């Protein structure tokens, strides 16, 4: 007869084969999330355009700056919040990942040879999608904030918009990576 531990592992086997890290109501595979979020940080920095000084006054395109998700103090991503209930924080991170994945798939980032699937931006897009799927509980769809419908950008706007989006993404994935590093170090079984 199989021991209870072996039975539990057998029950989890189909679940892990589907690539899910967060069963409904439980904690994620913190180490997997940590590794993927560290990769996202590296990709976000390598995807950043190599340009000189840019004047980034926030007076311009409100469409891509006002609705950008941020991880804030009240999101439960602090050590105590993660210990008590990590789901709110993970949902917030998931919302941000989906938001940036949509932006990277928009016309702001398409049509450029440097943005092909093997490019840093293409890899960044795929990694964002991978981590968001890793966080999505099976059979449970978190409410995602309304992704703003972007009007088509003009070619002359795209360089500045890319710069702003990638800069904001760098900050977001840096905080997410810290959350997952803490979770992997202190909350993993």
From Swiss-Prot:
Residues 1-19 form the signal peptide. Secreted by activated dendritic and phagocytic cells and keratinocytes. Also expressed by dermal Langerhans cells (at protein level). One of its GO terms (molecular function) is cytokine activity. Pfam families: IL23 (PF16649). Induction: Up-regulated by a wide array of pathogens and pathogen-products together with self-signals for danger or injury. Up-regulated in psoriatic dermal tissues, in dendritic cells of multiple sclerosis patients and in tumors. Keywords: Antiviral defense, Cytokine, Disulfide bond, Immunity, Inflammatory response, Innate immunity, Secreted, Signal, Tissue remodeling. Disulfide bonds join 77-89. One of its GO terms (biological process) is defense response to virus. Belongs to the IL-6 superfamily. This is Interleukin-23 subunit alpha. It comes from Homo sapiens (Human).
